[in-house]
Amino acid sequence: MKAGVSSACLYPLHTEDSVRAIAELGVKNMEIFINDISETEGEIFEDICRIKEIYDINVMSVHPFSSPMETLFLFSDYDRRRSTFFDMYRRYFDCMTRLGAKIFVLHGAILSAGCSDEHYIEQYLKLCHIAEEYGVTVCQENISYCKSKDIAFLKKMKKECGGRAKFVLDIKQAVRSKLSPFDIIDALDDSIIHVHVSDHREGADCLPIGDGSFDFSALISRLRATGFDGGLMVELYRRNFGENKELFESMKKIEALI
């Protein structure tokens, strides 16, 4: 297992500046949140790559800004939109090969879209097939306003994808869905290969590690029992912490439990 920090924590700072700021804290494992498609190529992308090399960063995962578009494009009934989407996401996968990132985080269709399970799984597998060409694994994240908030649906994905479905466990999203992260682990077992960590308590669902009451020791023990050997990425919203050093401190608290 490896503890790290997501560059999403410093939004709306430009992505390259977020990566640099987190690297300067001493963080070595990172998830990069791409905030615009322009950041997957050209001078901006080269700057991100330079920062990665200078600070010897292990980029474990990439999260796209375009998650809200997945409903309208990937899970649409309109074939041209899906084709456009696949072309766009190839750009993410291509830049991931340069960054060395292996995990791509997918939110998927929102609940109100009414996307059928069958259509969802079909399109997910098509995206997985494309990602595999680049050595990338598409991981479904549990999201409180998406189909993926439902444990039964996640279990169906796991079963019907024949072992190809992989998952990101997000603790704050589980809390917002009124689910126990432990129940999600029990349901998905070794299909969980990446985790977004944050603490919580009554009335506050996204806090630095140690500022809430969640039992991270039990979480790591349960994950270890499944054979989990992935990343535990601190992912907080900018309004939920003060100084940047709190991100590093949160990561170190997780690291101490691994």
Model-derived regions: residue spans:
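Active-site acidic/histidine proton-transfer and metal-coordination neighborhood
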Residues: 16-17, 54, 71-166
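N-terminal pre-domain/capping segments
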Residues: 1-91, 97, 132, 166, ...
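Conserved beta-strand positions in the central sheet of alpha/beta enzyme cores
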Residues: 31, 61, 105, 139, ...
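Short, solvent-exposed loop/turn segments at secondary-structure boundaries
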Residues: 42-43, 73-75, 80, 114-119, ...
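Residue-level detector of anion-binding/catalytic polar loops
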Residues: 28-29, 58, 102, 137, ...
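Active-site beta-loop-alpha junctions enriched in small/polar residues
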Residues: 6-10, 33-37, 64-67, 109-111, ...
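Histidine-acidic metal/acid-base catalytic patches
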Residues: 1-4, 11-26, 100-101, 150-169, ...
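Catalytic-core regions built around general acid/base machinery
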Residues: 47-54, 123-130, 183-184, 218-222
